[in-house]
Regions:
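Catalytic cores of nucleotide-sugar-dependent glycosyltransferases that transfer UDP/GDP/TDP-activated
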Residues: 1-175
Length: 175
């Protein structure tokens, strides 16, 4: 268990929320070693969803960007029996498929704290590791990319970075 604080800023009629945790977010640089980065962004993703009921904020859509927030659609599935989260949709945007948030399967399982059901080859498991972006792609309601041509390219073996099969299977939700 880690401390999780939230700060807010009101500017030009829009409220911005910031997740606080000194262990994960007080370092000299935003990215460090992959295992720490995976842990940090899993913590952030879980915090985002956990804070929504506390804030009384129920979005229609949560827009996730790259592997750093790809655990959100996975966690949202684990909350499916909670009426607060019913009907919330997710969009997963991929900017660069090369960066996937891959790390040790047991390390990711431990950090996420969810059941083995989510760690199979059609979900988070990826060649005996875990892949956060793969999980986000598997569970997001819609998948977007930086361009229509990139959406096509990543569905090929040449540019699909090992995920072209899943992306092709999700092609009806990919743009």
């Amino acid at each position: 268990k880690q401390y999780c604080g939230v700060f807010s800023l009101e500017r030009d009629g829009c409220t911005y929320y910031f997740v606080d945790n000194e262990f994960y977010f007080n370092g000299p640089k935003p990215y460090d070693f992959i295992h720490l980065d995976c842990e940090k962004f899993i913590f952030f993703s879980k915090a985002v969803l956990s804070l929504l009921p506390t804030l009384g904020f129920r979005p229609d859509v949560i827009h996730c960007n790259d592997w750093q927030t790809a655990a959100i659609p996975v966690f949202l599935d684990t909350f499916r029996d909670n009426p607060f989260f019913e009907g919330i949709k997710t969009v997963m945007t991929i900017h660069n498929l090369k960066f996937q948030g891959r790390w040790d399967l047991d390390g990711i399982k431990d950090a996420m704290g969810i059941g083995d059901y989510y760690f199979t080859s059609d979900k988070l498991e990826y060649y005996n590791d875990a892949n956060l972006l793969k999980g986000g792609i598997a569970y997001a309601d819609r998948i977007t990319t930086v361009s229509e041509s990139y959406a096509g390219e990543i569905q090929t073996p040449e540019y699909g970075e090992g995920l072209y099969g899943l992306l092709s299977a999700r092609s009806e939700t990919l743009s």
